[in-house]
């Protein structure tokens, strides 16, 4: 087992009792809040803790092979969105000429997938609570597969739009369910790394899209863009087949009262059987506190009823804080303009003075390599340094990079000679902006959205936050070119830099650190400390 990091807080001691094998004997806590106060720093806050028998042992972050395999298979779903983002940046160059469509139609075509993914995001929470996390992943892949086939065979703009709509719904399902499933499967000390894998695979997909553009761009125009879009069907098929080897989320199984199955999954994804029993006890306590399962139950008819009311109509103060944090980080993720910059990167580089199509596509490959490298780097250190430091570094770096891009673009607007240094500044600034995004907002948004909601609200709370993500992304994708041409690219990038500066302040004040805490413990950050000390979110 590979060690990737460990928490470095002082030693704290906690005594535990093993669970008997009988499900009916599982302990049920009626006071989850007080229980959290007593047990806040178990495996998550201590470098050393006590083994269930009471013997002190080192708690190290290890990569469980079974959890890693499940995380990789689920995250493969995210390649679908990444590939579409990357491939569309080059495909639109040929679609515009082949189908003879306007810039406005291009914006609608590009943005439609993100807007329609809102449908999948909103529906995914209820769907995953009803049919399970695994089968929601299958549904996402199957829906995107149909969309990819429609796009690859599209004879006209309207047919192509139909494919984008269907694929968008599949992307919406995928964006919510992949990080949620991985978060519920992962041990606390490696959850940051494993839950950031969907973003890693998004970047792998973007890079594959860029490579596809570069490789297929020399084919006849009527064929190249159709192949670029149609190739997305292959990862969708791989996901649908790979899900057969994935376990169901143990937390979903607990909510459905299937405690025996949950225990078997936990034994596979835990270091020891004792650890599995302790994790199961925490899950049962959280579920029974919500009234979804009792210790003696073997089944449950819970399907997520009453969740929207609790989230939107009668939220408690802690839930409001969680909503603000989750929606805020998703809003700023897309308000950064990252997706729009990637979608329209050839237009951005063309405005910077690069006009050869092959060169335009080639520069995007370099950008894709930079994004993929830095998201891998961030994922490896997420559980060592924590969410907040990387998020603040990434957002502040984006603000500076976008300001530099705005400066270079503004200079080129007023220059007749297009000096090489200004062109180089724009290229470097774009690569820096997407790299800082990959360090911070890219992976951490998915990690944070999937881990801060309590068990009963996690699926639909995540779907609500990610729906905001999709809406902002779609609006920006549909308006980026029009606004940029009206106020200039330079002014647009200065506006995005300002947005990232505001986002950095928001993250500093409203997002607490969740590194190393179990999903059941994270709620204490919003429930206990915040109630007792309003400034606790700053720590």
Regions found by a protein language model. Name each.
Residues 2-271, 278, 288-539:
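Alpha-helical transmembrane bundle of multi-pass membrane proteins
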């Amino acid at each position: 087992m590979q060690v990737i990091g460990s928490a470095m807080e002082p030693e704290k001691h906690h005594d535990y009792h093993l669970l008997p094998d009988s499900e009916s004997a599982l302990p049920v806590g009626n006071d989850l809040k007080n229980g959290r106060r007593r047990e806040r720093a178990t495996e998550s806050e201590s470098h050393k803790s006590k083994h269930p028998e009471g013997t002190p042992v080192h708690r190290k972050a290890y990569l469980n092979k079974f959890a890693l395999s499940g995380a990789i298979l689920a995250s493969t779903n995210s390649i679908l969105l990444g590939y579409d983002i990357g491939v569309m940046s080059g495909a639109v160059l040929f679609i515009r000429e082949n189908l003879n469509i306007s810039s406005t139609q291009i914006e609608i075509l590009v943005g439609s997938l993100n807007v329609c993914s809102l449908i999948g995001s909103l529906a995914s929470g209820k769907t995953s609570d009803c049919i399970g996390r695994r089968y929601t992943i299958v549904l996402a892949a199957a829906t995107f597969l149909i969309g990819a086939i429609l796009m690859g065979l599209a004879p006209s703009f309207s047919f192509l739009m139909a494919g984008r709509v269907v694929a968008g719904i599949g992307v919406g399902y995928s964006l919510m369910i992949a990080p949620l499933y991985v978060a519920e499967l992962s041990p606390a000390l490696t959850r940051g790394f494993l839950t950031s894998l969907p973003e890693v695979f998004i970047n792998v997909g973007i890079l594959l899209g860029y490579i596809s553009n570069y490789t297929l761009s020399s084919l006849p125009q009527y064929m190249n863009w159709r192949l670029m879009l149609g190739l997305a069907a292959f990862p969708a098929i791989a996901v649908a087949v790979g899900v057969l080897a994935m376990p169901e989320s143990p937390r979903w199984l607990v909510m459905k009262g299937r405690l025996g199955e949950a225990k078997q999954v936990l034994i596979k994804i835990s270091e020891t059987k004792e650890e599995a029993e302790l994790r199961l006890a925490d899950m049962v306590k959280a579920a029974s506190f919500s009234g979804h399962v009792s210790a003696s139950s073997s089944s449950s008819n819970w399907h997520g009823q009453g969740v929207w009311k609790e989230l939107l109509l009668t939220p408690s103060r802690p839930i409001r804080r969680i909503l603000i944090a989750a929606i805020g980080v998703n809003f700023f993720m897309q308000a950064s303009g990252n997706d729009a910059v990637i979608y329209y990167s050839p237009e951005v580089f063309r405005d910077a003075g690069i006009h050869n199509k092959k060169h335009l596509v080639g520069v995007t490959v370099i950008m894709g390599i930079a994004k993929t490298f830095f998201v891998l780097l961030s994922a490896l250190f997420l559980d060592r340094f924590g969410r907040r430091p990387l998020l603040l570094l990434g957002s502040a770096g984006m603000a500076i990079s976008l300001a530099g891009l705005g400066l270079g673009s503004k200079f080129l607007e007023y220059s007749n000679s297009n000096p090489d240094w200004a062109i180089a500044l724009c290229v470097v600034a774009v690569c820096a902006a997407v790299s800082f995004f990959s360090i911070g907002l890219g992976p951490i948004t998915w990690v944070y959205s999937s881990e801060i909601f309590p068990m009963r609200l996690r699926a639909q709370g995540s779907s609500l936050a990610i729906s905001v993500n999709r809406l902002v992304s779609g609006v920006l994708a549909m308006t980026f070119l029009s606004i940029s041409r009206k106020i200039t690219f330079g002014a647009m990038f200065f506006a995005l830099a300002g947005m990232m500066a505001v986002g950095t302040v928001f993250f500093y004040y409203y997002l607490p650190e969740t590194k190393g805490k179990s999903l059941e413990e994270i709620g204490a950050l919003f429930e206990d400390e915040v109630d007792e000390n309003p400034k606790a979110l700053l720590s």
